[in-house]
Regions:
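Extracellular glycan-interacting surfaces
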Residues: 1-304
Length: 304
């Protein structure tokens, strides 16, 4: 009798395991940010051959890049390793130098540190590794999309709101543009609309949660090609930039606008082959309608 009871219990246990396995495998998956505990801090000592050198910094926060990525929050006195492979930071359609991170592909502050990277060899995905506690823990966020990025940029307007812009699928002089927004410090990202425009992207930014810009044209443009949104990326329209006749074919590439006092300022440079005054000046334009139209103000030094 005992053998019968034991056999019956074993049979029921086996059925329970099988049912549980089936329910687990068929349940919908939920993508949650993963956390990685921070490794022990490594002190950088003067005179040590392995002393890390800051490549770029924002106040006391900076990074160093060797065969690993390190971060400091106290001007280089202490360093901690960022848990990411170097190759992921440069993956995609990038052929530049790898002795420093791709420009604009990271964000450094004492409250939030973030690095864009690419996951996967074939089906590449753009992701964000970020920390909200000065590197004690690191979170992974899936930005979205399945394309190998060329241009890539991450920025945060404040502790909650940020954006990612990247491009990919380049064919000759055209490519796709993707724009994503976060409102929870980088944990989740939502794709917003982008202009129905496929020229190569020069740069893009948001100056607040609603107002953003995308500047197109990198291959010998004849005039600036700037798009603006005033509703957080739900719609985009071409900005009107009034180029004086004497600067036609000279000021050709719009940079990203910025706030100066009560005005929006736009600098328009001469592109990669400009030679007006040695290519050392830009045009400064002012907008009074939040970026819809721009009026020429004056020439400024190219390094402004």
């Amino acid at each position: 009798m005992k053998k019968i009871i034991i056999g019956g219990c074993a049979c029921l246990a086996g059925i329970g395991i099988a049912v549980g396995t089936y329910l687990y495998e068929t349940a919908p998956s939920t993508h949650l940010p993963s956390k990685t505990e921070k490794p022990q801090q490594q002190e950088s000592l003067p005179g040590n051959g392995d002393t890390l050198q800051t490549v770029e910094s924002n106040g006391p926060v900076g990074y160093a890049l060797t065969d690993e990525l390190h971060i400091t929050y106290d001007e280089g006195r202490h360093w901690s390793r960022v848990p990411i492979g170097i190759e992921a930071l440069f993956a995609g359609e990038y052929n530049g130098q790898e002795n420093e991170l791709i420009e604009q592909s990271f964000f450094l502050s004492e409250d939030l540190t973030a690095f864009l990277y690419v996951e996967g060899a074939d089906d590449q995905r753009v992701k964000l590794l970020y920390s909200l506690d000065q590197g004690h823990t690191w979170n992974d966020a899936d930005i979205g999309g399945m394309i190998a990025p060329r241009f890539r940029k991450v920025d945060f307007l404040n502790e909650d709101h940020g954006y990612v812009v990247y491009t990919g699928e380049r064919t000759m002089s055209s490519e796709a543009t993707k724009v994503y927004m976060t409102h929870d410090s980088g944990e989740t990202w939502t794709e917003v609309y982008h202009p129905d425009h496929y020229r190569l992207l020069y740069d893009g930014n948001f100056i607040d949660e609603k107002t953003g810009f995308l500047s197109y044209g990198t291959l010998n443009p004849e005039e600036p090609d700037l798009y603006v949104t005033q509703d957080g990326g739900q719609s985009w329209v071409p900005a009107r930039i009034e180029i004086p006749d004497e600067y036609h074919l000279i000021f050709t590439t719009a940079e990203t606008p910025y706030v100066e006092g009560n005005d929006l300022v736009l600098l328009v440079n001469q592109g990669s082959s400009g030679d007006y005054k040695g290519g050392k000046v830009k045009g400064k334009f002012i907008s009074k309608d939040n970026g819809l139209s721009w009026s020429f103000q004056k020439e400024v030094d190219a390094d402004e």
